[in-house]
Amino acid sequence: MNMNATLLGQAISFAMFVWFCMKYVWPPIMQAIEERQKKIADGLQAAERAAKDLDLAQANASSQLKEAKRTATEIIEQANKRKAQILDEAREDAQTERQKILAQAEAQLEAERNRARDELRKQVATLAVAGAEKILERSIDKDAHKDILDNITAKL
């Protein structure tokens, strides 16, 4: 066999094989490669978007956390102010109640003191009249007795 004819036959067979591959095998392979490239590109874009979204979400979370801390601080300050206000009001109310109770106690004490004085005056007057009766050894009539008691009570 001639080497030229074999080489020519192999070249024709190879050309037909290349043509067949280019016609029927190559387009689906290229389509699969292009689809894969598109998926990879879309995946990279999605990853970039996700990274940007993550950065944005972290920034938002950070700002919301700062806002929440600021709000919490304001609420705590308001609560402390309200606590101080309530304590001041309670102190004022307690002081007012104390003054009221002291005034009532002083009034009761004064009334009791006056009642005791009046009672003591009456007892002293009665004892004085009894002593005077014994000294005089005679009984004084009721009108005279009352006048003497009133007179002694007024002097005391």
Curated annotation (Swiss-Prot):
Topology class, membrane: Single-pass membrane protein
Listed GO CC annotations: plasma membrane; proton-transporting ATP synthase complex
Pfam families cross-referenced by the UniProt entry: ATP-synt_B (PF00430)
A GO term for molecular function: proton-transporting ATP synthase activity, rotational mechanism
PANTHER family cross-referenced by the UniProt entry: ATP SYNTHASE SUBUNIT B, ATP SYNTHASE SUBUNIT B', CHLOROPLASTIC
Function in brief: F(1)F(0) ATP synthase produces ATP from ADP in the presence of a proton or sodium gradient. F-type ATPases consist of two structural domains, F(1) containing the extramembraneous catalytic core and F(0) containing the membrane proton channel, linked together by a central stalk and a peripheral stalk. During catalysis, ATP synthesis in the catalytic domain of F(1) is coupled via a rotary mechanism of the central stalk subunits to proton translocation. Component of the F(0) channel, it forms part of the peripheral stalk, linking F(1) to F(0).
Annotated keywords: ATP synthesis, Cell inner membrane, Cell membrane, CF(0), Hydrogen ion transport, Ion transport, Membrane, Transmembrane, Transmembrane helix, Transport
SUPFAM superfamilies recorded: F1F0 ATP synthase subunit B, membrane domain
Organism expressing this protein natively: Vibrio vulnificus (strain YJ016)
Lineage per the UniProt record: Bacteria, Pseudomonadati, Pseudomonadota, Gammaproteobacteria, Vibrionales
Compartments where found: Cell inner membrane
NCBIfam families: ATP_synt_b (TIGR01144), PRK05759.1-2 (NF004411), PRK05759.1-4 (NF004413)
Protein's UniProt name: ATP synthase subunit b
Gene3D superfamilies per the UniProt record, alphabetical: 6.10.250.1580
Transmembrane segments: 7-29
Subunit structure: F-type ATPases have 2 components, F(1) - the catalytic core - and F(0) - the membrane proton channel. F(1) has five subunits: alpha(3), beta(3), gamma(1), delta(1), epsilon(1). F(0) has three main subunits: a(1), b(2) and c(10-14). The alpha and beta chains form an alternating ring which encloses part of the gamma chain. F(1) is attached to F(0) by a central stalk formed by the gamma and epsilon chains, while a peripheral stalk is formed by the delta and b chains.
Family stated for the protein in its record: Belongs to the ATPase B chain family.
Paired cysteines (S-S): none
Top-level taxon of origin: Bacteria
